[in-house]
Amino acid sequence: MTKKIALLLLPFILISCNGLGPKRVKNIVELTPKLAIQTHEPIYLDSNANIYAFNANMLKNKQYSFARSKTITEPVFIGDMIYALDIRSNISAFSIEKNKIIWSYNLSRHKKDNYIGGGILHHNGKLYVTYGSRLLVVLDAKSGYEIIRKELPDIIRIKPIVLNDNTVLVQTISNQTIALNAETLKTVWEHESLAEVLSASYFMTPIVQYDNVIVTYNSGQILALNITNGEVKWNFEFTNLNDRTAIPNFDESSILCTPVHDNMNLYIATGLGKLIKLNVATGSVIWQVNAEDIQSMSLIGNSLFVTNNARQIAAFNPETGKVKFVADLNDGQDPKKLKSAAFLVPFVGVNNNNKRSLNVISVNGVLYSFDVDNNGLNMIPHVVKIIKNIRYYGLSANNNLYFSTDSKIIFGSK
């Protein structure tokens, strides 16, 4: 009898022992290594990139419904029209002036299916559309009439791009890059790398740089391909980075967010916990620094701004890779109580008094604005509650600032 009682009490005895029993699990904000200031250098927000006439009250303007269902890609603005692609593979043309959908066309023959990824390219009066299937569909932009479609070897999760007036480019999830004639969709050239079993969580839209197009593969490669014939000019592999080895099929071999570039350099955040600067002419590494779980990046003035899963915004010196500014995006809360948040690309806003601020939008519905004064960029932001689920922002065809969720759009001047 005594033995039976002892056995029944054993689990409770073990739980009460030091080191056993329930423990609080750290959240991703706590687990992400924080960036720290390494050098004290001035920050100038004086470039033309990512600077907009902006104030927080814009986000209270009227919201317009511009698509049939929830959108899955960034809207495209051409004149008065907004072209949007939704989760049901409907592409819609929305007139800003008339405040209504002018035409809508379903790209799939399986209307009940949900699709992920893809995008819209407007080129020479046509829309080249991918929607997370194997198909590239070309429509007349004015009428929505289907002109031609082509089935590719595998699913396409990124938008097509223009290589030149006669050629468009698509890339599949199985590491196939295919240049197509813009009229006939016949293959001009193609390049293929080793296909991986699992796909990366983020797919980078190829970047045209002079005579080359820069592409990435989920095997951990970045390549510069000649836009005329697809020849490889240079090839960089994440396995060349120090300290850790990229593992195919996992996030370590992936790119975490949209890279940024200037005329000579490409800045990339990798799943290896590295932020790297590449020379676009040669593919050589100029510098690499430790920076975990970067969400978004922006080149503004003399700084490379990044946000990360630790809910920080930081400024790197683009020349050296050293951190010169760090601030928290935490609403003043205890980090242990913070939930993860997704942050859009930082941008600079200029208000009616011509004063500038650095702004970060959280998809959770929070705007963080850092003022600039005589002492530089403030480390404590103004925190403003805004509408949730803003996914994109930018300039419309008439240079009007817009913000879009997965179903609504807001214009800055409306």
Curated annotation (Swiss-Prot):
InterPro entries: PQQ_b-propeller_rpt (IPR018391), PQQ_rpt_dom (IPR002372), Quinoprotein_ADH-like_sf (IPR011047), WD40/YVTN_repeat-like_dom_sf (IPR015943). Gene3D superfamilies: YVTN repeat-like/Quinoprotein amine dehydrogenase. It comes from the Bacteria. Pfam families: PQQ_2. PANTHER family: CELL SURFACE PROTEIN, OUTER MEMBRANE PROTEIN ASSEMBLY FACTOR BAMB. This is Uncharacterized protein RC0314. The lineage of its organism: Bacteria, Pseudomonadati, Pseudomonadota, Alphaproteobacteria, Rickettsiales.
